[in-house]
C-alpha cells in the first residue's frame, strides 16, 4: 500500500508535485522522484488487482478507469452501482477526450493515447508491469469528505469481495 504518492499535491489541491510535474503521467520517460520511488517499492511484485484512489477537482460526478483481462467483464459496473447511492456518477459521453460509459473509462484507451504522448500513469504502468486488472477511482472533491471516503471504501469493498482469498 502506497498511502499518498503526491503529498504536496494533496496539501495544495493540485495534481502536480512541488516541481510542477504531474506525477501520474511520469511513470514512463520523464520520471519524478515520487514515481521512481513507487516503481522501486513495487518492483518485482505481482498483484491480482491494482487499485489507485484519486480525487478529481474538475468534475462533479464519480468515475473510474478500468483495465480488465481480455474476455472478463471487470468490476467497474459493480463499483459504480454501489457509489450511485453516495453521489452522482459522471454522465457525459466523454471525459477529457476519452469515451466514458456508465462512469467507466477503458484504461486501454488511455494506454494508446499515453503511448503516443510518451507518458504513463500508475494504472497504465501497473497494468503493463504488475497486474492484469486495475482500477483508478476518481471521487469529486466537490463532495463532502465523508462521502468521498465512503465511495473509496466501497471501491475497496467490491475489490476485496472479488479478490480476497
Report residues per predicted region.
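Structured catalytic-domain cores with a bias toward divalent-metal coordination
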Residues: 1-165
Amino acid at each position: 500500500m502506497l498511502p499518498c504518492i503526491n503529498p504536496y499535491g494533496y496539501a495544495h489541491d493540485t495534481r502536480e508535485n512541488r516541481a510542477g510535474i504531474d506525477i501520474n503521467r511520469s511513470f514512463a520517460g520523464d520520471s519524478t522522484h515520487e514515481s521512481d520511488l513507487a516503481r522501486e517499492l513495487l518492483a518485482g511484485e505481482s498483484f491480482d488487482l491494482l487499485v489507485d484512489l484519486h480525487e478529481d477537482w474538475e468534475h462533479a460526478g464519480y468515475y473510474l478507469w478500468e483495465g480488465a483481462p481480455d474476455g472478463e467483464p471487470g468490476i467497474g459496473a459493480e463499483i459504480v452501482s454501489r457509489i450511485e447511492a453516495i453521489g452522482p456518477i459522471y454522465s457525459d459521453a466523454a471525459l477529457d477526450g476519452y469515451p466514458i460509459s456508465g462512469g467507466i473509462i477503458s484504461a486501454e484507451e488511455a494506454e494508446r493515447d499515453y503511448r503516443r504522448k510518451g507518458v504513463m500513469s500508475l494504472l497504465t504502468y501497473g497494468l503493463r508491469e504488475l497486474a492484469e486488472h486495475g482500477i483508478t477511482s476518481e471521487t469529486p472533491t466537490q463532495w463532502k469528505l465523508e462521502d468521498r471516503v465512503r465511495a473509496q471504501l466501497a471501491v475497496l469493498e467490491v475489490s476485496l469481495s472479488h479478490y480476497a482469498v
